[in-house]
Amino acid sequence: MSEMTPREIVHELNRHIIGQDKAKRSVAIALRNRWRRMQLEESLRVEVTPKNILMIGPTGVGKTEIARRLAKLANAPFIKVEATKFTEVGYVGKEVETIIRDLTDVAVKMTHQQAMEKVKFRAEEQAEERVLDALLPPARDAWGQSEQKEDTSNTRQIFRKKLREGQLDDKEIEIDVAAPQMGVEIMAPPGMEEMTNQLQGMFQNLAGDTKKKRKLKIKDAMKALAEEEAAKLVNQEELKESAIFNVENNGIVFIDEIDKICKRGESSGPDVSREGVQRDLLPLIEGSTVSTKHGMVKTDHILFVASGAFQVAKPSDLIPELQGRLPIRVELEALTSNDFKRILTEPKASLTEQYIALMKTESVDVEFTEDGITQIAEAAWTVNETTENIGARRLHTVMERLMDEISYDATEKAGEKFVINAAYVKDRLGDTIEDEDLSRFIL
């Protein structure tokens, strides 16, 4: 789990996301509180529940990007889901409990990788011995027992040295490795994915652990044998227990598009994908026990971060019980022309940086001037204001339109240099931006 301070988390988010300081502060505090809670005594730790967050803001202002970056920083089980993918219990579709099952799968995979990393050195040592056995089979006595002779031992050390120096990488050897498990594909109706996974696991277990002789280059053989030896050294039951503990205490669920499951207007009849889903989410967020293939998972201390544009619906359209379970409200501001300018240049691997690097592969130099970047930002902002406001995503559309000709002719223009200044931007985009009807369809 991440031990970064709130200030460090915000600093890291600033490298990729422009503005939205309130949202960054809220998620940074929530993430740090996960660490603080784990430092408490057991009796008090049980009482401290996470303060779930609701992020409100128009499309394209950074809600989803904050979630993506948070996932990398958290170093904890994290899953992002779309609220619109779920239906209430009893209808065809995914049930909300699959969120926790998927989160547990993420945790098991994460814990497995960490466990494999810990035993990597021992596994590589054992793999090395198996490769040396294949290169120099030990002599056996009349009873079939292996004999260790001094000259054989010396030869083995010579081969070990060559193996470590990579001199034998391309030599082929025949080894016994675990046969790949047969994949059993089972078509299941929606909502029954858990049962399908259990059936697939059952069929794979029936095959058992069989060995198969394979001819591999030593480099590939070392890798295959190291993985096999590492798997033997890892205790699967302990691994599952550790993963479930990690989910229950450090797990984070990001629910996007939550505004799309609000009930709109005075509609009559069942609202399968809206209010019913909200009611199903209640026990998960409040705290319940979910059955997964790895064991029972309690959701009492999982942090939930929900986000939505709320352009048609309002946060008050969520059912009152769900509103109460998302106590921290953060409003993200719409982006200005100046924000667009910063987005084009400041973040790590910014859009302008990406286009310069892409054209460099064709030996074409592209330079963006200060006034050119200002003009691109203003063009994107103008189109957002006059048509539909899609936030920073508009920059992708404008940049593609702007770079279209250079990208198409790049192969024939190797060695040339293009300067993207205000005049070039106006020339390429001017007419389209001024004609509102045209910009609706092109930008």
Swiss-Prot record:
Q: Which GO terms describe its biological process?
A: protein unfolding; proteolysis involved in protein catabolic process
Q: Which UniProt keywords apply?
A: ATP-binding, Chaperone, Cytoplasm, Nucleotide-binding
Q: Name one GO molecular function term.
A: peptidase activity
Per UniProt, ATP binds at I18, G60, V61, G62, K63, T64, E65, D256, E321, R393
Listed GO CC annotations:
HslUV protease complex
CDD domains of this UniProt entry?
A: RecA-like_HslU
Q: Is Chaperone among the key words of this record?
A: yes
Q: Organism's domain of life?
A: Bacteria
Tell me where it resides.
Answer: Cytoplasm
This protein's assembly is summarised as: A double ring-shaped homohexamer of HslV is capped on each side by a ring-shaped HslU homohexamer. The assembly of the HslU/HslV complex is dependent on binding of ATP.
**PANTHER family per the UniProt record, alphabetical:** ATP-DEPENDENT CLP PROTEASE ATP-BINDING SUBUNIT CLPX-LIKE, MITOCHONDRIAL-RELATED, ATP-DEPENDENT PROTEASE ATPASE SUBUNIT HSLU
What the protein does comes down to: ATPase subunit of a proteasome-like degradation complex; this subunit has chaperone activity. The binding of ATP and its subsequent hydrolysis by HslU are essential for unfolding of protein substrates subsequently hydrolyzed by HslV. HslU recognizes the N-terminal part of its protein substrates and unfolds these before they are guided to HslV for hydrolysis.
Q: What is this protein called?
A: ATP-dependent protease ATPase subunit HslU
Organism in which the protein naturally occurs: Vibrio campbellii (strain ATCC BAA-1116)
Q: What is the lineage of its organism?
A: Bacteria, Pseudomonadati, Pseudomonadota, Gammaproteobacteria, Vibrionales
